[in-house]
Amino acid sequence: MNAITVLLKTEHIAAVCLLVFGLTRAGAQAAQAADHLPGYQAISMKDDLAHRSPDIHWPAGFEPEKADLFAHNDLIINASCERVWTHIIAAKRWPTWYPNSKDVEIQGGDPVLRDATVFRWTTFGLAIESKVHEYVLNQRLGWYGYAPGAEPTFYHSWYLEPEGTMCHVVMDEAGVGKDVASLRKSDETLMHRGHDLWLATLKWMAEQK
């Protein structure tokens, strides 16, 4: 039984999966249908800003309060932060468990992300390039996202904090620019929903024995 099969056994995660796939493959009609599934509650950017983590190190120009789009997600995972970290940095393997990612290629052929790593991948149906900006082993990972050859328009951050034998995983992302503002206008919660799916599948992977 694979990760996606297991995840679809819960209504909340099924809703998230349908929303992501509906938006990237079948359009807004599938997204609207998924919004009405039991257990799913839409989150606004205002809600995410109110709950954002004070522990994220934001680079200049990507402060959440100034962003055109922002998403905050967090989840407790019943595994050590060291174990969770190994799955986060193994970017080449993301497509095997996170369905909103594909075609991950790390510059230099390294299988994992490191400080200053540059990598290309496809997410939300968009081919992008990313560069690691912050790397603190087992605790912090942050990267810029941009169209190849263009200036950064997104900053994605992970923050891992031990809670006993478990790990509190925070994922915050901010975007700036006209295209980002247009995305917010058309679908403000798209990024939040995609990140819900990412954390849910990460939890499934990290908690496997």
Task: Give the positions of each predicted feature.
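Bacterial N-terminal signal peptides that target proteins for export
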Residues: 2-14
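C-terminal segment of classical bacterial N-terminal signal peptides
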Residues: 21-29
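Hydrophobic ligand-binding cavity/cleft-lining segments
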Residues: 28-108
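Beta-strand/loop substructures that line and gate deep hydrophobic ligand-binding cavities in soluble
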Residues: 36, 146-204
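Short beta-strand segments that buttress and anchor functional surface loops
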Residues: 61, 116-124, 142-148
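Hydrophobic/aromatic beta-strand elements that line small-molecule binding cavities or substrate pockets
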Residues: 73-75, 128-134, 145, 154-162
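A short, structured loop/turn motif at beta-sheet edges
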Residues: 78-82, 133-138, 159-168, 208-209
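Short beta-edge strand/loop motif at the mouth of beta-sheet-based domains
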Residues: 92-127, 138
